[in-house]
Amino acid sequence: MKNLSLFLIFILFSFQNSFSFQNSIKPLLLAPVFSDHMVLQQKSDVSIWGSTSPNQDVFVAASWDEKVITKSDKDGEWNIKIKTPSYGGPYNISVISLKDTILLDDVLIGEVWLASGQSNMQWKLSNRLVNQEQEIANANYNQIRMFTVPLDLTGEKIKNSKWKISNSENVKLFSAVGYFFAKRLHVDINVPIGIINTSWGGTRVEAWTSLKKLRTLNATKDIISNLDLNADNNQNNKKVNDANA
């Protein structure tokens, strides 16, 4: 009853707003990691986030009868938690703003793992591999999916990244370690497995850690403080140079 009331409130709110107001609202966007064919962690409070215009209601409805509503902040960012059931699917999730609706289809609930590391984790099944042809040909596991973060510092390529279902074509670009881990786990516990591949050869773990966190760690806080100081000095020097130009 509570979920139904939330839904009715959202619908009534939508009809009360004028079409001219709707046209001024920014498009509803989801973080790229949320796409068709994704896997969400079972029996958890899972965060879903994205952006729209500031101070706008965002309604999320999952087909396992979970409905929640939130509001974007002053910058248009929003983040909401939904409760997931035990493993299963496929399900769908609707994300609704005043202007847009995004439908996520073929969503599975299971176990989600992060595959992070350097070149060993990055190594693809399309690279040299023992029994490569046989492994690729037999890689048709509908309940194994992988999301691969592209090697791109601009943040642009990830906008087009999607979850991929394991099959003899998609698996060629999967992390080999990530795939074989997922395959073994899926065979052993018989639940959907999602792998988020964030590997990049030669990178240090600090590069994958937020500045906020690095400032709190004994091993890195002094280094970050020096970087902050250098950045401030560079900014001050730029202001002086601009003033003298």
What are the residue ranges of the model-derived segments?
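Cell-envelope and extracellular/periplasmic
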Residues: 21-245
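Bacterial Sec-dependent N-terminal signal peptides
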Residues: 1-25
